[in-house]
């Protein structure tokens, strides 16, 4: 059974393997053992309530409960930008007009922004290519909503998610090549690595402070503003079906879109509910895939089951109960996996 659980120190080797498969562009999962070890330590200190809000971040892994193999990672930052500034470009408009000359130009413009400061962030979503089947991607992404619903007071009103922008297999980013490289004087991969390993001071020091007309960028760069990497398109679709929207904020490095939603408007959070769990053999029937999660903060578990999403009493097998770290009589959180049926 595939389950979501909190990260542990022993996961470092598995995370290094995952980091090596990202192909670059996933800033928060660099192939750097010291950085990943520090990330694990920060997550564990978050669970033990040892950190201020601006440093808190939860990390989860997707594990095969029978073999112990890890095939995916996902994370939540509690409040971004409270320690280091959190930058986006806001894609806006500047108008230049002259009645005398009968000229009117509305020009798309990039404005440096810290508007999402304090928001909670969904981040570091990566699934091993060999695990991209049987609903694993949905479980990995949406399990975070079950955790947020259970421990709502830990998170802020707005939730954001930076989506990976357009980068080719050689690490070439059209947006970076046309804009960022002119100010940072380094390749995209170098800037991405520095940011991913926590060396972010250079961003504030070298970022252009004035609005930038997108017409000054190459046509290739203009075309990728707000667009996602092909491998990220499914993740974007998942979030949009949960209520997330693109509000014209983009990543300063690759131009990928930032999606956002009020936390209480996220479908899986809004519609999830607590039901009593019993041990037994689930009744046969053509039931939809559902997310189920325990309410244990330190030993959180989430998985997929076939069930009636409207049931008041969820029957699970002994193996399912064991994987979810719960017992008969406990209450678990349940919600339909998708607004529309998704076969897994």
From Swiss-Prot:
Record SUPFAM superfamilies: Acyl-CoA N-acyltransferases (Nat)
Catalytic activity: succinyl-CoA + L-arginine = N(2)-succinyl-L-arginine + CoA + H(+)
GO molecular function, one term: arginine N-succinyltransferase activity
EC number: 2.3.1.109
Keywords in alphabetical order: Acyltransferase, Arginine metabolism, Transferase
Function statement: Catalyzes the transfer of succinyl-CoA to arginine to produce N(2)-succinylarginine.
Family, per entry: Belongs to the arginine N-succinyltransferase family.
Identification of the protein by name: Arginine N-succinyltransferase
Gene encoding the protein: astA
């Amino acid at each position: 059974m595939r389950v979501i659980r909190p990260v542990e120190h022993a996961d470092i080797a598995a995370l290094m393997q995952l980091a090596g498969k990202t192909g670059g562009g996933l800033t928060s999962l660099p192939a750097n053992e010291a950085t990943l070890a520090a990330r694990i330590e920060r997550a564990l200190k978050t669970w033990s309530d040892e950190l201020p809000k601006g440093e808190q971040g939860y990390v989860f892994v997707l594990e095969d409960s029978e073999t112990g193999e890890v095939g995916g990672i996902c994370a939540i930052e509690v409040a971004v930008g409270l320690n280091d500034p959190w930058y986006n470009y806001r894609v806006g408009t500047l108008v230049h007009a002259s009645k005398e000359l009968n000229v009117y130009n509305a020009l798309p413009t990039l404005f440096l922004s810290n508007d999402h400061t304090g928001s909670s962030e969904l981040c570091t979503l990566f699934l091993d290519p060999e695990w991209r089947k049987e609903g694993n991607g949905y479980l990995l992404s949406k399990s975070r909503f079950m955790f947020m619903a259970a421990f709502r007071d830990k998170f802020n009103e707005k939730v954001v998610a930076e989506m990976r922008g357009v980068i080719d297999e050689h690490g070439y980013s059209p947006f970076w090549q046309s804009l960022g490289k002119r100010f940072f004087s380094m390749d995209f991969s170098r800037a991405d690595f520095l940011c991913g390993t926590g060396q972010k001071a250079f961003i504030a020091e070298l970022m252009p402070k004035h609005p930038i007309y997108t017409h000054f960028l190459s046509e290739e760069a203009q075309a990728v503003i707000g667009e996602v990497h092909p491998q990220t398109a499914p993740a974007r679709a998942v979030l949009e079906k949960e209520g997330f929207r693109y509000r014209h904020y983009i990543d300063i490095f690759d131009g990928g879109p930032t999606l956002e939603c009020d936390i209480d408007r996220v479908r899986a959070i809004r519609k999830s509910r607590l039901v009593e769990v019993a041990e037994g053999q689930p009744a046969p029937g053509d039931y939809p895939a559902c997310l189920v999660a325990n309410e244990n903060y330190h030993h959180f578990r989430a998985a997929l089951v076939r069930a009636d999403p409207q049931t008041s009493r969820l029957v699970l097998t002994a193996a399912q109960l064991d994987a979810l770290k719960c017992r008969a009589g406990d209450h678990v959180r349940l919600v339909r996996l998708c607004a529309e049926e998704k076969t897994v």
